[in-house]
UniProtKB/Swiss-Prot annotation:
Protein name: Ribosomal RNA large subunit methyltransferase H
Organism: Haemophilus influenzae (strain ATCC 51907 / DSM 11121 / KW20 / Rd)
Stated family: Belongs to the RNA methyltransferase RlmH family.
GO annotation, cellular component aspect: cytoplasm
Record's keyword annotation contains Methyltransferase: yes
Its biological purpose: Specifically methylates the pseudouridine at position 1915 (m3Psi1915) in 23S rRNA.
InterPro entries to which the protein is assigned, alphabetical: Alpha/beta_knot_MTases, RlmH-like, tRNA_m1G_MTases_N
NCBIfam families xref list: PRK00103.1-1, PRK00103.1-4, tRNA_RlmH_YbeA
Predominant place of localization: cytoplasm
Annotated S-adenosyl-L-methionine binding sites: L72, G103, L122, S123, P124, L125, T126, L127
Subcellular location: Cytoplasm
Catalytic activity: pseudouridine(1915) in 23S rRNA + S-adenosyl-L-methionine = N(3)-methylpseudouridine(1915) in 23S rRNA + S-adenosyl-L-homocysteine + H(+)
Subunit field text: Homodimer.
């Protein structure tokens, strides 16, 4: 199973890239974890946000292909680390690749939300999208470590 984080936005601050890559490199070869960045639509005073969201959503879903779509969204289900570890095992047993979608400044398109088989909430707070990349990478690595009895996670 491959996990792909599909996120709107490019040119992240160096701390985001460093943090994400630190956890990305720790994933085992049998569970590759990759990042696909979708360029954000041009936003300005007269921007058509609905159209921008639609374009970003189409690009995200195209990048996912036939993978299981999981959105990262405030109304999603909050998981504890042990619950996320269970989800990781369920995703592996499903046999499909998993695509985790992080929207842009206005969130995810209605098409992305409709395509989602699951929705995961990291917090009831609105988090900066760059920070979400790092939090997701660390959370997934921690969940993996729990499933393999790796000493990274401690209760």
């Amino acid at each position: 199973m491959k996990i792909t984080l599909i996120a709107v936005g490019t040119k992240m601050p160096s701390w985001v890239t460093t943090g994400f890559e630190e956890y990305q490199r720790r994933f085992p070869k049998d569970m590759p974890f990759e990042l696909i960045e979708i360029p954000a639509g041009k936003r300005g005073k007269n921007a058509d946000i609905k159209r921008i969201l639609e374009q970003e959503g189409k690009a995200m879903l195209a990048a996912c292909g036939k993978g299981k779509v999981v959105t990262l969204d405030i109304p999603g289900k909050p998981w504890t680390t042990p619950q996320l570890a269970e989800q990781l095992e369920a995703w592996k047993n499903d046999g499909r690749d998993v695509c985790l979608l992080i929207g842009g400044p206005e969130g995810l398109s209605p098409e992305c939300k409709a395509a989602a088989e699951q929705s995961w909430s990291l917090s009831p707070l609105t988090l900066p999208h760059p920070l979400v990349r790092v939090v997701v990478a660390e959370s997934l690595y921690r969940a993996w470590s729990l499933t393999t009895n790796h000493p990274y996670h401690r209760e």
